Amino acid sequence: MDKFNINEKMKRTKIITTIGPSTHSPGAIEELFKTGMTTIRLNFSHGDHAEQGARIVWAREVSAKIGKPISVLLDTKGPEIHWRIKGLLQKSLNIYHQMNNSLMFSPSFCKFLHYHYTLLLSKKTKKQLLKIVKKLKKLQSQHYNLAHGLRETWTSSFCFNERPSIWRLLSSFKQIVTSFKISLVSKVLIKL
């Protein structure tokens, strides 16, 4: 494989495409690259390491063939909180249902507390996005501007305009989670 010039300028804006079963061939990756894709995303929640490794090899082959670099983004399986809806309802939490509606909030400078979770839903609520509001509203009253968006991948981001102490923030979440009797593993991402 040819080596790329390390000093060559790369585009800062990336067009990311998730590679999955429908794009599982070198030809498909090449077609995506020709139509403007700059980065392939590999979701390690689905597929084994050998399958994902083959996709990386294909991307490198296409990259060498065309003569331009293709970035590879690995979306590894992160920590998950498994919410048992029945258990939450027994705790008398207010759960609000909304059909295909979510709040999106993206200021230029903010801190994100980012975590993944899986909702175990009954057939009735499978089509709806759930918002668990009651316990999280306590954070709003503590001078945080809180916005909550649910995405297709069930990834939640909490965005804070102010710059609170991260440890204070995590301890607030720890209290909430302790009241739910659920263990939370989280990571803090700082957006610059």
From Swiss-Prot:
Pathway: Carbohydrate degradation; glycolysis; pyruvate from D-glyceraldehyde 3-phosphate: step 5/5
Residues noted as binding substrate in the record, renumbered to the chain: 41
Residues annotated for ATP binding in this entry: 43-46
Pfam family, one: PK
Listed PANTHER family: PYRUVATE KINASE
Family (UniProt): Belongs to the pyruvate kinase family.
Protein name: Pyruvate kinase
Gene, per the UniProt record: pyk
